[in-house]
Amino acid sequence: MTVFHFTGIKGSGMSPLAQILFDAGEQVQGSDVDKYFFTEQPLRERNIPIFTFNADNIKEGMTVIAGNAFPDDHPELIRAREIGVEIIRYHKFLGEYIGNYISIAITGAHGKTSTTGLMAHVVGGYKPTSYLIGDGTGAGHANADFFVMEACEYRRHFLAYNPDYAVMTNIDFDHPDYFANIEDVYSAFQSLALQVKKAIIACGDDEQLQRIQAKVPVVYYGFGSENDFEARNVEKTTEGTKFDVFVRNEFYSTFFIPLFGDHAILNTLAVITLCEYEGISPDIIQDRLHTYKGVKRRFTETDIGDNVLIDDYAHHPTEIRATIQSARQKFPDRELVAIFQPHTFTRTQAFLQDFADSLSLADTAYLCDIFGSARETQGALSIQDLASLIEGSAVITTEGIDILTKHQGAVFLFMGAGDVHKFQDAFEAVLKNDETA
């Protein structure tokens, strides 16, 4: 049996793909840096071997699946070529693998992971479903009918896929280290649209997505009356959100979701639209929506005493606004304290004022040093540049995390795509120590 070796196994796409292959009965191992990432937990639960990067990890007879962040001159990839081991990039492997299923690719600047998790949960209540989610979780089923996957636009990686369905949640300017402008982003989505085989499910409230041209039907969802699937009569409470769905102006069904914020309604509409297209009944959809528990690092709550700590992956101004809106709905009478760690210097520079504006929607904002990516470790600006634009903000470190204790009974939003979890871990330790003191 071939051993699949994942170079960069802790990656947000690589980890779930390794889980999927393992669940399908394949022999899997991988390597990465010797640093904890939340994506490794499900790997360890399966006892999948994880090594530190080393050329000696590569043996004859393996197939190496290489993460997109690692160049061809990575020591493991050099060794693989030296001994004639096949190397296949993550997105190319996945593009070939999904051909065995009814594939549903979820893409968009924001909402990919949440929508993928919800789609997998709902469709999985109808027929066996394999899924790959960007929160580091994946599952494979030997007899799966559907394959639900998160598809990222960065470096146009999603063009390796020819899915049956593409769900497009929105188009927004992000990844400024790669995309030149919004037109460049749009062109990537337009290219993907031409590769879809059955239908495109797109948010019609997004003006960029209204321009999409395709060889297959484009079915629109949203709040606007011009959409094919429309949410009406929205009722927001501290328990969740209830709304009616109309299909081409005819009442379809009423749904309740234990989720918060307008973006959650839109994500759910995307799922409902796909399900209706595949003939899944409203009863099945509603039953599955009721039991949805969310995905990792997307509004993940921890209660300590009368404090609420929320972990969220928000790392773009649009996502920060959505997270704060969700918190306002669920905790309307509580102080909201944002703790934000910017992710990459290029993104921080490109959206500096927009970050300041979005973070100002919280009652108080604390900032952590900028988290550089594997592609960049320093930049021309510092966290002080952002702090100077947010009135009353402060820069914090893990050592000085106890400053947060002055906000008793607050909702603390820990946001970022780097290692912001270490700030939450430090604060949790302080709170638990205070409880036992």
UniProtKB/Swiss-Prot annotation:
Signal peptide: none
MF terms in GO: ATP binding; UDP-N-acetylmuramate-L-alanine ligase activity
E.C. numbers: 6.3.2.8
A GO term from the CC aspect: cytoplasm
UniProtKB keywords: ATP-binding, Cell cycle, Cell division, Cell shape, Cell wall biogenesis/degradation, Cytoplasm, Ligase, Nucleotide-binding, Peptidoglycan synthesis
Ranges in a coiled coil: none
Reaction catalysed by this enzyme: UDP-N-acetyl-alpha-D-muramate + L-alanine + ATP = UDP-N-acetyl-alpha-D-muramoyl-L-alanine + ADP + phosphate + H(+)
Tree of life domain: Bacteria
SUPFAM superfamilies in the record: MurCD N-terminal domain, MurD-like peptide ligases, catalytic domain, MurD-like peptide ligases, peptide-binding domain
Keyword Cell wall biogenesis/degradation (UniProt): yes
Binding site for ATP: G108, A109, H110, G111, K112, T113, S114
Metabolic or biological pathway: Cell wall biogenesis; peptidoglycan biosynthesis
Family as reported in the entry's similarity comment: Belongs to the MurCDEF family.
Functional note: Cell wall formation.
Name listed for the protein in its UniProt record: UDP-N-acetylmuramate--L-alanine ligase
Naturally occurring in which organism (per UniProt): Lysinibacillus sphaericus (strain C3-41)
